[in-house]
């Protein structure tokens, strides 16, 4: 029988430059999701600090916030995808920062690290963070997925590059309310054009002078909305068989050719 994956959309108000507050809120979300039998919980971009250009907020992959998130995942036996600003060494041995999406296994160990490929020059992100060079495809309970971060959403070629290899795309973001209509449209478009599930998790609240109003959502491979209403932590089920059925009936991806 084809495996399915229950994913929780962990939207919350991130504490600005306040990992203690942020991690406490994240724990509430994760524990609530576990009660709903979620196997994967998705948290927003930079989920411990908010979207910040303060290099001092970044931490190494073995830093305290990451250790806390790993322990949290292990304590409730869920996998956890969380956005963190990380500090690491470049191949040349220099210190560099990345806006990352990190997948923790249900044993608390880091399973995958995706680095945001398109940094947001409009906000000065390009002056602080080094862009990632490649997509990351991983598997959670037999379901193939690729994580992306916020501004990546505006570049459809990034998603098309992995479409045939995944069942789901997961987007984590700090997407301001002022551009919410773009978020709503682009998230759904990525599901329709790539014929796969899309799970997109945004934050709420205030941070860095900006207002965030959530809008976390999930769509099936036909672009139909899946996000339940009236629950604090919504969950959706990813079914690879549905992806195959849509692609077999409407084999649009077979006709794809890269532009000359």
Task: Annotate each predicted stretch with a short phrase.
Residues 39-40, 145, 168:
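Structural motif
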Residues 235-260:
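Short, basic/aromatic-enriched C-terminal tail that caps enzymatic domains
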Residues 19-20, 24-107, 113, 176-196:
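Cys-nucleophile CN-hydrolase/nitrilase-fold catalytic domain and related Cys-dependent amidase chemistry
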Residues 11-16:
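Short polar catalytic/cofactor-binding loops
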Residues 90-164, 178-185, 245, 249-252:
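Active-site catalytic loop in hydrolytic enzyme cores
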Residues 64-81, 153-235:
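CN hydrolase (nitrilase-like) catalytic-core segments centered on the catalytic cysteine
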Residues 82-84, 99-103, 136, 216-218, ...:
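Short beta-strand scaffold segments in enzyme catalytic cores
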Residues 2-8:
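Extreme N-terminal starter segment of soluble prokaryotic enzymes
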